[in-house]
Amino acid sequence: MEQQQRYISVLDIGTSKVLALIGEVQDDDKINIVGLGQAPSRGLRAGMVTNIDATVQAIRQAVNDAELMADTKITHVTTGIAGNHIRSLNSQGVVKIKDGEVTQADIDRAIETAKAINIPPDQKILDAVVQDYIIDTQLGVREPIGMSGVRLDTRVHIITGASTAVQNVQKCIERCGLKSDQIMLQPLASGQAVLTEDEKDLGVCVIDIGGGTTDIAVYMNGAIRHTSVIPAGGNLITKDLSKSLRTPLDAAEYIKIHYGVASCDTEGLGEMIEVPGVGDRTSRQVSSKVLAAIISARIQEIFGVVLGELQKSGFPKEVLNAGIVLTGGVSMMTGIVEFAEKIFDLPVRTGAPQEMGGLSDRVRTPRFSTAIGLLHAACKLEGNLPQPENGAVQEREGGGGLLARLKRWIENSF
């Protein structure tokens, strides 16, 4: 009897793009990426939905393209979320161990106790991530099941979000005929994809610079300790270039991606770049030194906000023994690692997702870190979910027609 294929699917709904990935889970729980779709995102600002219809259309297009490539239809997704409405805090729950030996039921009760906190009425708990356990006086326990004791403490990192903001994201997903089985904070997903266990143990901060937000996650002693979402990202750099160079936004985005340099100290500056004019105005030549000055000012501002956030969190840069890991689209910019090392006075590297099978070569860039981390999270949840249908893929409403979808699939594939 032929074994049923096991699929997982994720949605990374960002300010600049919506990305859908479909993975096939192998017998050894390794993931082959078999479907990829992406669409420009015009219905979000700083990670929050501002236009339901535009967001729905982008999700449909991305999902349709991923389904066509994978030749399967998905019904359930794991979704990444960000936005300046996100809050986080650390909490602790305590329970008596029943029968003197820790069971999963004891752990569940301890986590629920930790979640019994006062939060603003307009916020809801999105996730509670276990940091470690304490059994009686034994600290730093990571796998407590089966251990003997009287009292179980669990320390958790709790993430909350604005109820209406979360509902708007879920509404967009449901209008596409999908169910979101879990919502995961985007910096947690990025950390899952790009960090090593040694970095998490020593102390590290992952900085994911996306289009609309800069997301940070601090790990220490193997667990998440602090998360934050800063409402500033690569789109501000694009707007800075557009205003300073008096060029359309699309042209500014192209210039940022192809010629952008993060620091004025980068070697080889001086190349002349053609900058299109607005409307019928003629284009002109601008030195890459000018671009670097515009871009570095904004990046320095973003890194300054990150430094302040780390200081407020109780995890200043001095405790980050493994340094900084940059990821997200902006982290691919020339000179940004050296610029970050100068500002943070820490070792810095660019983080790309770990290798997977299937379309791995296509997605092993920092732009896909969040989506790959979401795939890992979806894989852990996968056992209890209904599976998608193989074979002919029915088109979702608003998908743009079969020919349009086929054209996008070819563009994504080659």
Curated annotation (Swiss-Prot):
Stored Pfam families: FtsA (PF14450), SHS2_FTSA (PF02491)
Membrane topology value: Peripheral membrane protein
Database matches in Gene3D superfamilies: 3.30.1490.110, 3.30.420.40
Subcellular localization: Cell inner membrane
SUPFAM superfamilies listed in its UniProt record: Actin-like ATPase domain
SMART domains named among the record's database cross-references: FtsA
GO cellular component term of the entry, any: cytoplasmic side of plasma membrane
A single BP term in Gene Ontology: cell division
Keywords: Cell cycle, Cell division, Cell inner membrane, Cell membrane, Membrane
Keyword Cell cycle in record: yes
UniProt xrefs under NCBIfam families: ftsA
Protein family per UniProt: Belongs to the FtsA/MreB family.
Additional information: Present in outer membrane vesicle formulations which are used as vaccines in human.
Job of this protein: Cell division protein that is involved in the assembly of the Z ring. May serve as a membrane anchor for the Z ring.
Record's subunit section: Self-interacts. Interacts with FtsZ.
PANTHER family the UniProt entry points to: CELL DIVISION PROTEIN FTSA (PTHR32432:SF4), CELL DIVISION PROTEIN FTSA-RELATED (PTHR32432)
Protein name (record): Cell division protein FtsA
Species per Swiss-Prot/TrEMBL record: Neisseria meningitidis serogroup B (strain ATCC BAA-335 / MC58)
Gene of this entry: ftsA
